[in-house]
C-alpha cells in the first residue's frame, strides 16, 4: 500500500525539482545576459528565480555549472536544427555536399539570430575559467561533423568553410544582420576543393 501513496508524492517532488531547475536556468540566462558572467552572482540568480541558494546547489555545482549547462543546451538545440536541415535537404534529393552544408549552416545561423542574446553570451569572452578550451573542443567537433559531408580528401575545404562560418557566426550575432548571413552563405557556397578550382581555371 505504501508504494501507492509514495509514487505520486515522488512524482510531485520530481516535478517541483524539474520546475526549480528550469527556473534557475532561465534566471541564470537573464542575469548572465544583463550583467555578464563575471559580474553575476549566485544571489542574483536565486533572487530572480525566487529560489533558495540551497536549491541552486542541489541542481548545480555553482555559477560556472549554470553557464556551461546553458551552453550545452543551446548547442544541443543548434545540433538538432542543423541535423534536421541536412536530413530535409537529402530527403528532397539534394546530393551536393556543399549545398547540404549550406542548408545546415543556414539553420545554424537562423538559430543564432532567433536566440541572439544567448548566442552572444558565449562569444563575449566572459565565460568561466577554461571555457575557451570548451569552445575549441566544440569547434573541432563541428569540423568533424562537417567533414562527414565531404570526401576524405577534402580536408582543406572543410577547414576553410568551417573557419569562414565560425567567423560569420560572430559577426552575424554581433550585428543581427540576416542579409549578411545570406551573403556569407552565398560566398561560402561558391568555395570548391583546390583540385576542382584548378580544373576550372585551366578549363
Where are these regions (language model features)?
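Helix-turn-helix
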Residues: 19, 23, 27-65, 69
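Hydrophobic alpha-helical connector segments
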Residues: 69, 83-114, 157, 161, ...
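Hydrophobic alpha-helical segments that form the core
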Residues: 4, 100, 107-110, 153-192
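Pre-recognition alpha-helix immediately N-terminal to the DNA-recognition helix
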Residues: 23-31, 77, 103, 107
